[in-house]
Design a protein with these regions (language model features):
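C-terminal motif of bacterial Sec signal peptides marking the signal peptidase cleavage site
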Residues: 16-19
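Bacterial signal peptide processing site
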Residues: 21-23
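Conserved alpha/beta catalytic core and glycan-binding cleft of carbohydrate-active enzymes
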Residues: 373, 377-380, 384, 611-612, ...
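The feature marks proteins involved in alpha-glucan
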Residues: 39-57, 84-85, 92-175, 213-278, ...
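Carbohydrate-binding surface patches
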Residues: 275-291, 818-860
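C-terminal beta-strand-rich structural cap/linker in extracellular carbohydrate-active enzymes
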Residues: 345-346, 877-897
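Short proline/glycine-enriched turn/loop motifs at strand-loop junctions of beta-rich domains
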Residues: 57-61, 183-190, 286-292, 861
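Substrate-binding/active-site clefts of carbohydrate-active enzymes
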Residues: 396, 409-589, 602-619, 623
């Protein structure tokens, strides 16, 4: 922590010391004009700058500034002192680089904590000041920058800060369990009154002393004997003593929402959504704060008009007519109504009224299908959605360590002209399972699409998001997007169906997809994004329960997702939603697992309960894993996050191992020129994280291979080909061999093995490292590359077959401790043995990187039979002194009977 003393204070101190010594002469800075004793000096050049910071609660000791120059490290700085505006901190130009006054300085105001402790930012945005666009004060030679808490604007002039109510919130005292209303002001008041729906219930002129916890000129803490009515509005008015002005504020309930008393009163563990039978449908929605809910039932999911990119678009066949039904508020804040008729195929919405929204129409968060663009939920009879033979479809219970996961986007598999399937089915669920497609070039024909995946041999496909996204689903206007913009979690995305207007079609076609893959021995894992929504404002969650479902930092949405908001899995009703949602999706669509985006934003308790529910109530072998990190700073306490550092707390789920990825190729956030063990050819690379990954990440991510997913590439960042090329490798043969070497280690490691679709033939996105909304062409699987790189494809086939069929990669954590990984003197060669006790084979694995080593790269393969040589050397003879070339993998086996 750096503390810079006030420049003004230093100057004044110098003058004071001079006076004490009897020396009355002083010298002014060279850039100040000489004046008489009665004139103020005037600065002709600036000497520094001052940040001024105002908080209505005057809590300056709890905050500091993080400041950095462009391209340099930052530091924490405490505020020097306070004045009539607030806290301030002053710097001399001498504290910074010589040219700073001609440039800019970056800053964050945050809680006075280390970054490792997840300090809350005053505003989420990183801000900066460009001095050349400002004027300095000629009175003191300083640029003055004025900041206000909660306001991201950077001001160049002093802002008005008047009398304010600085706190108006209900909370719970966790020692006494009392519910209290806490009111604070920044100036003395003569009167405070609280009105509930217009009726005065508290006045400082007539207080019930038995309920007063504290009463001063600037603060009132008042006890409530029971839970306040959270559907009412509590208006606080404060009359300020000095001016007589009256300020008002609405009391917030947000601090109650995580309390035991709130959960006792409002947590609901029953069914929610449209509960359908042919005789009647009951609608249930949780909204304790609302004063009115109206159910609207439509004949169609298509409105007369939709808004796309700010423009109104008319839809053929659209209809805005609906039947209206008033809902009744019951226990736990659940609103319900029952319609005694068969509503299958109808669509519905809720119109919600509370203190934040008036008759705003939303889709039920529990809706299970929808019409075009997810604007109206659908009432579904799921018995009408099952394809022939659906009852015979069952998730194949593979051991999770035998999983070979193939990550693919619905559109990518079929968007290339080289797919050669039915043109109308390209980019759709139907195209994803269309059989008998191929591509021919010259005299060579290769399988494409679904047949390509079957030929490759993977046993699991992980689909990029297929839930309903905030996209325009019209087939004639659809554009590519990864899909990390959630709209309706329990609804399938309509743009992948042949008819996005009919909520039944997407369900039927996706079930056909699952069935086709199941018949091919391939399970489906769904990528889920519960950590944020596309837009918090007017989202169905926020409309139903403002300030409950999301995390906040100083009144603004916390942005740990990097997408503008983050959901609060630690709030019991959102935890319930995640658990209910995954159970529905896994059960109805016969999914084998889930991949959680930015899982670090979810608390471990939620993930543990979710995993237990799926294992107990859906499938004991269901696979659950996620990204064990966040996308930014979150307000969720670090020891609660489902991140790598808390892996020992995970129960029934695992996470990606980015450590083996970075050790091999320096992926993720590394500079593109950084090199790993695979791509570094000129110096020795570390092997620690590689060895850890091979044995289930025992020493780094914990000692349980059932909790690790080993990989080198995924949809994020570069493809493997592009990543190697970005590191400066230009020779095509070298790139090919490096790519195969990287995934050879992945597919022969303990734990789940994961790959990005297309790596089996060196897929490229033309160097695009973030193709989330790039063109279909950038993201397509180009099957001409399969012909070009058939040797790569063949190597992947063998690696995948070995992973799945040899009894080598389902070791317990105790067994993994006994695996011995060997390497040569400089680590350019790694080799080890595994025993298949069931089939009585000993396998030997050897991997050589591209470092031109002077150390031995000899491995004893005497008596072994070759299974795989990734370089396909025609003259290779296994012996007691087999020499591996650079970038070569040799796998061989022998009988141990």
């Amino acid at each position: 922590m750096k503390k810079i003393f006030s420049l003004a204070f230093v100057l004044l101190s110098a003058l004071a010391l001079a006076s004490c010594s009897g020396n009355t002469e002083t010298s002014l800075p060279d850039n100040a004009k000489t004046t008489t004793s009665t004139e103020k000096k005037e600065y002709t050049e600036s000497i520094g700058f001052t940040f001024h910071y105002y908080r209505s609660d005057a809590d300056y000791s709890s905050y500091n500034m993080w400041i950095w120059e462009n391209g340099k490290e930052g530091n924490d700085y405490e505020f020097n002192d306070t004045d009539d505006y607030g806290a301030y901190i002053t710097f001399s130009w001498n504290d910074w680089s010589a040219n700073l006054k001609n440039g800019s300085i970056n800053f964050i105001v945050k809680e006075a904590k280390a970054w490792a402790d997840n300090p809350v930012k005053d505003v989420e945005k990183d801000r900066y000041v460009t001095f050349s666009s400002m004027e300095f004060s000629k009175e003191d030679g300083l640029y003055h920058i004025y900041l206000k808490s909660g306001d991201e604007t950077v001001y160049g002039v002093k802002q008005e800060v008047g009398e304010e109510i600085t706190k108006s919130q209900f909370n719970v005292d966790y020692d006494t369990k009392q519910i209290r209303l806490n009111i604070q002001t920044n100036k003395d008041v003569s009167l405070i009154e609280v009105k509930k729906d217009g009726t005065t219930i508290i006045s400082t002129n007539n207080l019930d002393d038995s309920k007063v916890i504290k009463n001063t000129d600037t603060e009132l803490i008042y006890k409530f004997d029971e839970m306040p009515d959270i559907s009412s509005k509590y208006i606080i008015s404060a009359t300020f003593r000095e001016t007589g002005k009256i300020k008002t504020a609405v009391a917030s309930f947000a601090n109650l929402y995580s309390s035991e008393v709130f959960n006792n009163n409002y947590y609901y563990d029953g069914d929610l959504g449209a509960l359908y039978t042919k005789e009647a449908t009951t609608f249930k929605v949780w909204s304790p704060v609302s004063t009115m809910l109206e159910l609207r039932v439509y004949d169609t999911g298509t409105p007369e008009k939709i808004t796309v990119n700010g423009k109104s678009v008319s839809l053929a066949g659209g209809n805005n007519s609906y039947k209206s039904y008033q809902m009744t508020k019951g226990e736990k804040g659940v609103w319900s109504t029952t319609i005694n008729e068969d509503l299958a195929g109808k669509y519905y919405t809720y119109a919600v009224t509370n203190s934040s929204y008036k008759s705003l129409e939303i889709v039920d968060p529990y809706a299970k299908s929808a019409g075009i663009n997810g604007l109206r939920g659908m009432i579904v009879d799921f018995n009408e959605t099952n394809p022939l033979g659906w009852d015979d479809v069952n998730v194949i219970n593979y051991d999770s360590q035998s999983l070979t996961v193939y990550e693919c986007h619905i559109a990518d598999l079929t968007s290339s002209t080289t797919w050669n399937g039915t043109a109308s089915k390209a980019k759709t669920y139907q195209g994803f399972y269309e059989a008998s497609t191929s591509y021919t070039s010259g005299n060579t024909t290769v399988k494409t699409g679904f047949d390509h995946i079957k030929e490759l041999g993977v046993n699991t496909v992980q689909l990029l998001p297929i839930f309903d996204q905030a996209n325009d689903e019209r087939l004639e206007t659809r554009s590519f997007n990864w899909g990390y913009n959630p709209l309706n979690y329990n609804v399938l995305e309509g743009s992948y169906s042949s008819d996005p207007y009919d909520g039944y079609v997407r369900i039927k076609e996706f079930k056909e997809l699952v069935k086709a893959y199941n018949e091919a021995g391939i399970n489906i894992i769904m990528d889920v994004v519960y950590n944020h929504v596309n837009s918090l404002a007017k989202s169905n969650f926020d409309v139903l329960m403002p300030n409950y479902y999301f995390r906040y930092s100083n009144g603004s949405a916390s942005n740990g997702s990097g997408c503008g908001n983050e959901t609060a899995s630690d709030m019991l009703m959102y935890r319930k939603f995640m658990i209910d949602s995954t159970e529905f999706l896994a059960s109805e669509y016969k999914l084998s697992g889930f991949r959680f985006d930015l899982m670090g934003l979810h608390d471990v308790t939620t993930m543990n309960e979710l995993a237990k529910n799926l294992h107990d109530n859906v499938n004991s072998s269901i696979t659950i894993y996620g990204e064990p990190w966040t996308g930014g700073t979150t307000t969720l306490t670090q020891n609660l996050q489902a991140t790598q550092s808390n892996l020992s707390k995970f129960e029934g789920f695992g996470c990606f191992n980015d450590k083996i990825r970075d050790a091999l190729i320096k992926g993720g956030l590394a500079a593109k020129t950084d090199k790993g063990w695979i791509t570094e050819t000129k110096k020795i690379s570390t092997t620690t994280d590689i060895i850890s990954g091979l044995i289930g990440s025992q020493t780094i991510l914990g000692n349980d291979p059932y909790k690790t997913v080993n990989y080198v590439t995924c949809h994020d960042n570069y493809t493997l080909y592009d990543r190697i090329k970005a590191a400066g490798i230009t020779d095509e043969e070298t790139i090919k061999n490096m790519a195969v070497l990287a995934n050879s280690l992945v597919f022969t490691s303990q734990g789940i093995s994961f790959m990005l679709s297309g790596e089996e033939f060196l897929r490229t996105k033309g160097g695009n490292s973030n193709s989330y909304n790039a063109s279909y062409q950038v993201n397509e699987l180009d099957y001409s590359l399969k012909i070009k790189n058939m040797d790569v494809f063949n190597n992947y086939q063998k690696l995948i077959a070995l992973k799945q069929n040899a009894n080598l990669f389902a070791r317990s954590k105790e067994e993994c401790k006994n695996i011995t990984i060997n390497k040569n003197n400089d680590g350019s060669l790694i080799y080890f043995d595994l025993i298949d006790n069931e089939n009585k084979f000993q396998y030997r694995f050897a991997y050589s990187n591209g470092y031109k080593s002077t150390a031995s790269k000899n491995v004893d393969f005497n008596g072994f039979t070759l299974y795989l040589d990734t370089l396909n050397k025609e003259d290779l003879v296994l012996s007691s002194d087999t020499v591996l070339d650079e970038l070569e993998v040799i796998i061989a086996y022998k009988s141990i009977e």
